[in-house]
């Protein structure tokens, strides 16, 4: 399996990713193949517009029941709404993954120039 070079986020979340405020994302197994130490391009899900680049720090298993306030804060959504959204996106899936990342240094410079 090849190493992913892109990741998408809902457009409403991309300002948080691009500012470095959002540093995790919760995905299912099909989207868990990111590799720590790699850099990936961030695109909006809706329009495929490139937003920035992030460096993958970790990919760790996460059970649905382990989703907590920290995850909700990172997703900029209340915990009950986050759990409902995850169930909508990944119905009947308990085995999830939390991908931890940071804004790539070159991305922050480019964003400040805009």
From Swiss-Prot:
Q: What does this protein do?
A: Catalyzes the hydrolysis of N(4)-acetylcytidine (ac4C).
Q: Which residues cross the membrane?
A: none
SMART domains, A to Z: ASCH
The species this protein belongs to is Vibrio cholerae serotype O1 (strain ATCC 39541 / Classical Ogawa 395 / O395)
The annotated active site, in chain numbering, is 22 (proton acceptor), 25 (nucleophile), 75 (proton donor)
What are the entry keywords? Hydrolase
User: Where does the record place the ASCH domain?
Assistant: 8-93
> What is the top EC class of this enzyme, as a single word?
hydrolase
Which reactions is this enzyme annotated as catalysing? N(4)-acetylcytidine + H2O = cytidine + acetate + H(+); N(4)-acetyl-2'-deoxycytidine + H2O = 2'-deoxycytidine + acetate + H(+); N(4)-acetylcytosine + H2O = cytosine + acetate + H(+)
Q: Which domain of life is it from?
A: Bacteria
Q: What is this protein called?
A: N(4)-acetylcytidine amidohydrolase
Family membership:
Belongs to the N(4)-acetylcytidine amidohydrolase family.
What NCBIfam families does the database record attribute to this sequence?
Answer: PRK04980.1 (NF003443)
Q: Which GO terms describe its cellular component?
A: cytosol
Q: Which PANTHER family match?
A: UCP029143 FAMILY PROTEIN
Q: Which Pfam families match?
A: ASCH
Which EC numbers characterise this protein's activity in its record? 3.5.1.135
């Amino acid at each position: 399996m090849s190493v992913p070079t892109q990741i998408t986020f809902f457009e409403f979340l991309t300002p948080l990713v691009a500012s470095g405020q959002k540093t995790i994302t919760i995905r299912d197994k099909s989207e868990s193949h990111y590799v720590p130490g790699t850099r990936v391009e961030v695109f909006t899900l809706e329009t495929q517009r490139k937003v920035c680049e992030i460096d993958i720090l970790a990919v760790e298993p996460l059970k649905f029941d382990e989703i907590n306030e920290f995850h909700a804060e990172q997703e900029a959504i209340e915990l009950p709404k986050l759990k409902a959204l995850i169930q909508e996106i990944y119905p009947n899936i308990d085995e999830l993954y939390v991908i931890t990342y940071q804004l790539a240094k070159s991305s922050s410079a480019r964003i400040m120039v805009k």
